[in-house]
Amino acid sequence: MQQSIRYKGLSLTPDEMAVENGALSLCGNLELHDGALRPSIVTGTPLSQPLTINGVVAKILYVHETGNYRHLIAIASSAIYWFLQDGSLGSTTPIKSFDYEASVLSVNSIGNTLIIVATDGIHYALWGDGGYKYLPQKPPFVEISFSISDDYPENYSNGGVDAEGSTNGFREAFQQTTYSCNDVFNKVKMPFIDSLFKDLECLTIKEDKQSDITQSIYALVNRTNNLIARNGRFYANFFVRYCYRMFDGSMIMHSSPVFIPVQVPDSYMVLSANASQNTTNYLLDTYDDFTFQREDGKGNKSKVNIKKVAFYYYPRNVDLNYTILDSKRDELEEWKDVIKSVDVFITPPITNIDTSEKILSLRSLHRNYKLGHGLLSLTFESNGIRIGDTSVHFPSLSVDAYRNKLKNTSAFYKVCSLKISDLTNYTTKKLPVDKNAVYQVSLQEQMKDDYKTHNSLFAKGSYVYNHRLNLYGMKEKLFQGFNGSVMFPGQYILKYDDSTDNLMYRYKIQKIVVSLNTTSGTKYVESSDKFFSRQDIDSFIISNLVKFYPDSRADKMAIFCKDSSDNDVIFVFPLEQCAELNGAMHMGDFTDNLEQYKVDSFDYTVDDVVELSNKIYTSESDNAFYFPLNGINTVGIGTIQGIASTTRALSQGQFGQYPLMAFSTDGIWAMEVSSKGTYSSIHPISREVCSNPKSITQLDQSVLFATNRSISRIAESQVVSMSDVLDGPGFNIYGLGKFLNFFNDTEEDSDTVKSTKAQMRQLIDFTSSPIEFFQRCQVIYDYKNSRILCLDVTQTSKTSTADTVALCYSIKDNAWSTFLIQNVLTAINSYPHPYIQYRDGSVMVLDKGYDYEDTTEYHGIIVTRTLKFNEDNVPDSITGYIHSLTSGSIPIMWLYGSNDNQNWHYIGRLGGMKSSYMATHSYRFFRIALYLKMKSMNQYFATRLEIIRRFSKF
């Protein structure tokens, strides 16, 4: 009878009786294609020259390709260079040189931005003007200090008061009523001594006049404030904050919100124009008819005559100034392609006034303070009578309500953009605000809050999908924190008057330490204050103004100071998570005493790295520099080893929503893509754990990866092993002595023959377990030839021209084989064509299909698994054979037989195309070994055997 043996690829499963005829114990330099064997050839376009720098091979890391260029990114001697597609060096100046302690983990790109992930952080390089411009891990944070100007005089309304005008403007605005003092006020008795020094209620407003007086005072305040705001100036307290505006409009690296105490503790200072400092019978003297002189903006005096109850408003009318405190502006200039401006945002005016309540009284000697000067005062005298010591007592929020109002202020509106080219170091300038923006501030663009963009990121790898950079295996280095010059205004006096020894209450800030409660334990960050360490800061500022850290996990801030005697002093403030802002802060209510926060010691050690190994950070679309909050996802509890995408939906009928897979130490996870391009949900799909991240390879509709027991692919939601046939021990080829001896060198052999025999011996000697091989190999997808190549990149001890054994998987035929390839340095999957680089620096682009025009003669060998010709296992004899092939070169065939499937007996070596009669012994089992010489156009289809059964069972 005849048996046709069609070969099925490499198989190492232990049970010889379970495998089909045609399975192979050895398949070297041959691969299965459409059911036939053909030479295993790596075809493609070689680069015209190897990648070398001064004779040193540059290892290819990435192919940076856009519609306009294709560059090979490679590393040599810890420096990254770029090469043109032909292999020529693009520039002798490296893109980036690394310390020898750092190593590059991955390289990716989005548009013209190259992203280099290294052990020392994330690095960037922008292509433009014929070269790459290196950018460090983060833009420098330019420290800007804000302050306010002196008050501007203005032509305020006189509100019915008879007053001489001036083109130079005045500092006060008036409002006169139609009532006399007796119509409006009830006088309150004050002890004489207290009336000279204490803040006391001195006048109350009669109940029937409270509404009218309240309306008159607010009319005075509102029209004056509107005039100031229309000029782009400020009259009340507010917060200011700045951030970087990126090329795509994103906002990053927000500053601390800085509270500008234009006037504290009250929001407005409105004074009685009728009440003097004099008293009669412990009652304040008031005057319906009073004339005095005031000064205009240049000190010229003019007359004012009061006829009825009147009030004057001493408003703050100030510019917002800014100062660049460091030299980082020059460093920021390097980022001008990414950072387009420094945008400044403010809040609407914040007051402690409760406008729902009526004004009921006035107080004597009530003190307000203004930033930069201290006590706020405006009095007038005439004939020994002084007015201006009695101020309107505005109904106000409770202390707690005002504190909460300040803490929960979260809406910041844009009033100014500063171009990087306009920034000047160490120079105080007026902030060029948009006047209309200040007047209608709540209609302006609102600041989008920050989420940890000051932190430095470290990753184990990167993956670009959907124009977004995905970083995985994360660590973050916490931001060192803002120093005092960024958190506090740039003016150091606030609560100041002549009765205080102010130097006793001023401190030089040396450093600021913040503690954070993280998943990695308590962390400490430290910021040295080089600027404020030379300045005496009002203790009132330190205790009451904002202390902020841009991370809600922060719980304490310790400020280390020097007092006026140069003694070390430490103040520790509790930080509370902000309700709206991403951060934690402490802020007083302008009654806090700094001494209550004083401590003897604060022990810490700087520890600022947080492990985030199960996080994936996804950037904004087409912006590899910014990772928004909604792009940060947690995947399981393990460490993410790699990411890959698939093009097929995991659930048929759904919106293709799980295109990205994360390979973690606790399994494989699928991530759902939201309409915004970020990942809205994450689901586990397999317990399989990838054991070799270099094996993760995207195929057309699946992803391939290696585990410690197989190489598998995940398609849809199913994980399928591709290497079950390789899970077993290798066959002892040395038991086939005659076959093995054929490839030993003889004296008559030419160098070419010896080289060929050495290659065959290398294939025979490859006894490495494929499963172990998968743990160290690099996998690439040869799309043109529909096969997977598993390449050994660990053969560092071999010469660059030596051959190494690789594994090949034919996707069409589901068949494995081995083949020889020149010693591989690395290989990368770069859509649409992979690249192989050999250890001599030469590079092959696998951009061609199988070359059927190649006239080179290739050599290959196969050894079958046990051949069985009947189920009864009775002895048979092989009496003839025919080779079915298209080659003109005749194969050499060795036949072996066995009765126990263990010990193999040599039957013979046959060199003809066919044989009709062969005298052989009878055996239950057989093996065939073939040595073939084939050109690329040739195929070996099958071996047809003539079988005669010698014995049968009775």
Task: Map each language-model feature to its residues.
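Short Trp-Ser/Thr-centered turn/loop motifs at beta-strand boundaries
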Residues: 249-280, 284, 525-532, 543, ...
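Conserved aromatic anchor
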Residues: 217-232, 284-336
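N-terminal beta-propeller domains
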Residues: 1-92, 144-215, 227, 232, ...
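Beta-sandwich interaction modules
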Residues: 99-109, 311, 451-460, 904-948
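Beta-sheet-dominated scaffold domains
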Residues: 3-6, 109-113, 468, 645-854
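Exposed low-complexity, polar/acidic, P/S/T/G-rich flexible segments that act as propeptides
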Residues: 344, 850-857, 871-885, 933-954
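Surface loop/turn motifs at the tips and blade-to-blade linkers of beta-strand repeat domains
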Residues: 51-54, 95-99, 634, 684-688, ...
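Hydrophobic or amphipathic alpha-helical targeting/insertion segments
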Residues: 103-156, 160, 342, 346-408
